[in-house]
């Protein structure tokens, strides 16, 4: 009878403190498609049919971040050190002496079960293995100018997980007290031969802000979280000599009436954002019964909605506003309105449309009793 394979351990190294990926916190705790990067990476190994014992190495200050995460109950959590090597050593310290270990960077949440299996099979067969992709781009040498080229034959882009015999890699790390690019370098310095198995372009390492969108597309199968919100508002004319529309003062024989400055354009855009977020409307956040909002400038409301969207992880990608009125004429000030709206939404003016129409003299707008506005906003999760 064939002897069953020994159970393997997976060490997820997640003790880093770097925040260059943005977000104001270590990247492994940021969320992608509703889950933290830690959850994605840990559960990749927990879901593998090999039945890994999973060890998560974190910084001591991050212990509280585990609360409420979707992690396996069998997960072992240990505290890492001041360097990656120290964190790997902490993880290896709790591994059993026999068997094999796969060491994985938490910042690669898109690793496939196939890559994990390939590394595990090659490690069991030869004692050590790691995934990599051949370098296909031309390589240059130089600083601000090209001083030469580099032959790319035999060059590889390293990935994780990197697999080893537990005892061998533990001894290699114990003997190594310097810096190393990864565990393969530590292993080679100890005389361990490491096999190369095919890597995967999807197994990207999240390093900069732009990598989050790529990772989300990979993890969700390209099914991005896109929201569309609609807004509609009406304000009647009253005494005055100007109207505020889209943050621009437009001279007119009458003004618009309202609790605030009655900017029907900004109100409609604000409600469209709240609608896309399922966050009610302006009245929910700025009740007209509250005297502090009497005669308030409407950009306050729109800025609140924009910041709420950003805090929820959404970017505004498009805004389309239609003003419905007979007077005043919108065409002469439409460009200024677009620029002001783009500034408030924090997007390029090319993503903002402000246009006007009439109701062919029908209804209250046709009778010039007021102005109506309709807006559509598109939000995309970052």
UniProtKB/Swiss-Prot annotation:
Matching Pfam families: IspD, YgbB
CDD domains assigned to the protein according to its UniProt record, in alphabetical order: CDP-ME_synthetase, MECDP_synthase
Binding site for a divalent metal cation: 233, 235, 267
Region named 2-C-methyl-D-erythritol 4-phosphate cytidylyltransferase: 1-226
GO molecular function terms attached to this record: 2-C-methyl-D-erythritol 2,4-cyclodiphosphate synthase activity; 2-C-methyl-D-erythritol 4-phosphate cytidylyltransferase activity; metal ion binding
The entry's keywords: Isoprene biosynthesis, Lyase, Metal-binding, Multifunctional enzyme, Nucleotidyltransferase, Transferase
EC number, UniProt record: 2.7.7.60, 4.6.1.12
Positions bearing the site annotation: Positions MEP for the nucleophilic attack: 152, 205
Location of the region described as 2-C-methyl-D-erythritol 2,4-cyclodiphosphate synthase in the Swiss-Prot/TrEMBL record: 227-382
Pathway: Isoprenoid biosynthesis; isopentenyl diphosphate biosynthesis via DXP pathway; isopentenyl diphosphate from 1-deoxy-D-xylulose 5-phosphate: step 2/6; Isoprenoid biosynthesis; isopentenyl diphosphate biosynthesis via DXP pathway; isopentenyl diphosphate from 1-deoxy-D-xylulose 5-phosphate: step 4/6
Marked site: Transition state stabilizer: 20, 27, 259, 358
InterPro entries: IspD, IspD/F, IspD/TarI, ISPD_synthase_CS, MECDP_synthase, MECDP_synthase_CS, MECDP_synthase_sf, Nucleotide-diphossugar_trans
Binding site for 4-CDP-2-C-methyl-D-erythritol 2-phosphate: 233-235, 259-260, 281-283, 357-360, 364, 367
Cofactors required: a divalent metal cation
Biological processes annotated in GO: isopentenyl diphosphate biosynthetic process, methylerythritol 4-phosphate pathway; terpenoid biosynthetic process
Catalytic activity entry: 2-C-methyl-D-erythritol 4-phosphate + CTP + H(+) = 4-CDP-2-C-methyl-D-erythritol + diphosphate; 4-CDP-2-C-methyl-D-erythritol 2-phosphate = 2-C-methyl-D-erythritol 2,4-cyclic diphosphate + CMP
Similarity section: In the N-terminal section; belongs to the IspD/TarI cytidylyltransferase family. IspD subfamily.
Cited NCBIfam families: ispD (TIGR00453), ispF (TIGR00151), PRK09382.1 (NF006899)
Record function comment: Bifunctional enzyme that catalyzes the formation of 4-diphosphocytidyl-2-C-methyl-D-erythritol from CTP and 2-C-methyl-D-erythritol 4-phosphate (MEP) (IspD), and catalyzes the conversion of 4-diphosphocytidyl-2-C-methyl-D-erythritol 2-phosphate (CDP-ME2P) to 2-C-methyl-D-erythritol 2,4-cyclodiphosphate (ME-CPP) with a corresponding release of cytidine 5-monophosphate (CMP) (IspF).
Name this protein carries in UniProt: Bifunctional enzyme IspD/IspF
Organism: Jannaschia sp. (strain CCS1)
Gene for this chain: ispDF
């Amino acid at each position: 009878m064939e002897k069953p394979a020994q159970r393997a351990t997976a060490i997820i190294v997640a003790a880093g403190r770097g925040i260059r990926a943005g977000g104001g916190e270590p990247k492994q705790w940021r969320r992608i498609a509703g889950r933290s990067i830690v959850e994605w990476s840990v559960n990749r190994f927990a879901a593998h049919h090999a039945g890994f014992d999973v060890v998560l190495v974190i910084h001591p200050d991050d212990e509280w971040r585990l609360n409420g995460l979707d992690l396996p109950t069998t997960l072992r959590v240990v505290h890492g050190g001041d360097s990656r090597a120290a964190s790997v050593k902490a993880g290896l310290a709790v591994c059993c002496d026999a068997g094999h270990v796969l060491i994985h960077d938490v910042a690669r949440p898109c690793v496939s079960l196939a890559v994990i299996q390939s590394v595990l099979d090659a490690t069991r067969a030869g004692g050590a293995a790691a995934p990599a992709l051949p370098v296909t781009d031309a390589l240059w040498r130089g600083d601000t100018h090209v001083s030469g080229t580099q032959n790319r034959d035999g060059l590889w882009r390293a990935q994780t997980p990197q697999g080893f015999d537990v005892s061998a890699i533990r001894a290699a790390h114990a003997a190594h007290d310097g810096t190393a690019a990864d565990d393969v370098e530590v292993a080679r310095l100890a005389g361990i031969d490491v096999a190369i198995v095919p890597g995967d372009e999807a197994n990207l390492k999240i390093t900069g802000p732009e990598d989050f969108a790529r990772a989300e597309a990979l993890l969700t199968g390209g099914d991005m979280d896109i929201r569309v919100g609609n807004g509609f508002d009406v304000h009647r004319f009253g005494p005055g000599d100007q109207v505020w529309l889209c943050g621009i003062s437009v001279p007119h024989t009458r003004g618009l009436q309202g609790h605030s400055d009655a900017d029907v354009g900004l109100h409609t855009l604000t409600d469209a954002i709240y609608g896309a977020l399922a966050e009610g409307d302006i009245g929910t956040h700025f009740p007209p019964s509250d005297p502090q909002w009497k005669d308030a400038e409407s950009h306050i409301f729109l800025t609140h909605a924009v910041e709420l969207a950003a805090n929820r992880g959404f970017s505004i990608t498009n805004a389309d506003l239609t003003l419905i009125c007979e007077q005043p004429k919108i065409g002469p000030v439409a460009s200024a309105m677009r620029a002001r709206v783009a500034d408030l939404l924090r997007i390029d003016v090319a993503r903002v449309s402000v246009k006007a129409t009439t109701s062919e003299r029908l209804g209250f707008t046709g009778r010039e009793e007021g102005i109506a506005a309709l807006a559509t906003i598109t939000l995309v999760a970052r």
